[in-house]
Amino acid sequence: MISVAAAVEIIQAHWPNFGDTTMDVDGSYGRVLAESIEADRDYPPGDRVMMDGVALAWSEYHQGRRHFKLLGTVAAGTPQSSLPDQTGCLEVMTGALLPQNCDLVIPYEEVAIADNQVKIINPRQREPGEFVHPKASDCRAGKVILESSSKLNGPAWNIITSFGKTKVRVKQKPRIQIISTGDELVEITQKPKIHQLRRSNIYGLQVSLQSRGFQNVNLTHLADDKEVIIRHYQKAKLEYRVLIYSGGISKGKFDYLPEVWSQLGVTKYIHGVAQKPGKPMYFGIDHRSKTVIIGLPGNPISSLVCLHRYFLDSAPIYAQLTTDFTFKKDLTYFLPVKLSHTPQAVIKAEPLPVKNSGEFIALAGSDGFLELPQHQASFQAGECFPFYAW
């Protein structure tokens, strides 16, 4: 078996590029840019007023003038105006272009206005450019404002729409099929007999993928029949770029999948990781059809943990154990936990250990899992470890 770190490195090294596509900005939330975005103009395009108040010439204020005649009002969204007399001032609104001949804005809170006269009631020292957002201080036209591979979250949307982008080039998300296997599984609409289980695993995997922006996820089921598995694979590899199998990858008599994949020319990169749960995990590539093959254990906790740890591109945060915990096997252990936060902004992780990887009901109160390192048996309260959220 290989280590968790080695498995991560192998998957990252062999994960294919699924290409890119152009789409409307409206539907691009959460996608990853496949192009760099450049500013189409200076930003701000002109000196911009940052506070409602009055605009005036700093030189007059610096020379001691504290009373100014009010000569007009400038609203946001109007062409740039000009101050005709430097002994006067103009009312200006946030977002307006700073009038010509003005280089100082004084907020309403620091002036008194009566009978078209403005009195400065806070005669403090001021500098030119106060409450002014200078032209091109954020960026010049032509500057790259979002790098390729940036994720299109809320701030990124603000940026690209501010510069007139209505369509963006993004990395293509693959078509995915999740395949449950096993003669013991029945539809969730059926009432299972005592020797049967509802095939719930794949729904947990599906919503986990959908929560990360993978919307094109199909579900199907296969019996423990080698010929059925072969026929399905030969068709599915042409329709989907990623095939995720749940179950059928261990050493049981009816665990045909690794044998079938080898027979059909899949290149195996991983089969067995020194971890609990999820030890039998499989990863391979069919290089002829460029299809990714992911084999997850059939136990619910194992499949969810492996998906989140290796295939959802999740960056961990670090959380602190609330109590001592012991795990004596020489394996990386993924420990379900419930998070809480202290007033000092410390993230605490309360262990919710399970008896076995089929005890999925115990996950109901958990927020995710800690990754406890291999070659360590005792983990002390207060120690910090990587946390992955469901």
From Swiss-Prot:
Its EC number is 2.10.1.1. Its cofactor is Mg(2+). Keywords: Magnesium, Metal-binding, Molybdenum, Molybdenum cofactor biosynthesis, Transferase. Transmembrane segments: none annotated. GO terms for molecular function: metal ion binding; molybdopterin molybdotransferase activity. The keyword Metal-binding applies. One of its GO terms (cellular component) is cytosol. It is an enzyme of class 2 (transferase). The keyword Metal-binding applies. SUPFAM superfamilies: MoeA C-terminal domain-like (SSF63867), MoeA N-terminal region -like (SSF63882), Molybdenum cofactor biosynthesis proteins (SSF53218). NCBIfam families: molyb_syn. Belongs to the MoeA family. This is Molybdopterin molybdenumtransferase. It comes from Synechocystis sp. (strain ATCC 27184 / PCC 6803 / Kazusa). The gene is moeA.
